[in-house]
Amino acid sequence: AAEQQDGLNYDLWADTALTTGPTGQLSYSLSTTMPREHADSEFASVNAARYSGGDTNVPKDVDSLAADHTSTARSDLEKARAIEQFLHTDGYYSNEDTINSRPGSSQDRIERMISAEALVGDDEQYATLMALMLHSQGINARVVMGAYREGTSGGVDLTGSDMHAWVEVEFPGVGWATFDPTPPRDQQPTTQVNKPKSVPKPQVLQPPEP
């Protein structure tokens, strides 16, 4: 703490604080209790909680995209699973480390994602898109940030690369159902270069023999 305090500078006129950062890596320890995971059968006969938050700056085509992929669903659970399956199967994974994906989950980023020829994004963007699609169907959903769990007991070391985002839907009286719309990380887009069309050479009439 003393080292961090020595490296902290504050600009009164800019109302900005700047730190030189820690000299070494920081680590944190915590304990938690994992909630019980519910089976789909527990949610099948329960309607999801209604969403009435009123999202602002929603990317265009979110409503129609959700409607297209939930048209045959008979329950809120089936709607959520249908959207999850669509994104997980038809989408491609790519993070901000590549030229195929931009970081963040702003309106512009999600709008470009769904208007492109193929869905390309990371877990944060897929979770955001799924939550917006569920909201358009009146289903209360939230984006959750966390990490993949390995095992049910004991300690585990987590780093930034272990962080993940997924979606949870509220079912009153039962709990929150978990949905992971992110495609597998090895399901990445490929850039296909079309071969140039061959142009036939014009035929040239040969002069008659003398």
Sequence positions of predicted segments:
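Residue-identity detector for glutamine
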Residues: Q4-Q5, Q25, Q85, Q107, ...
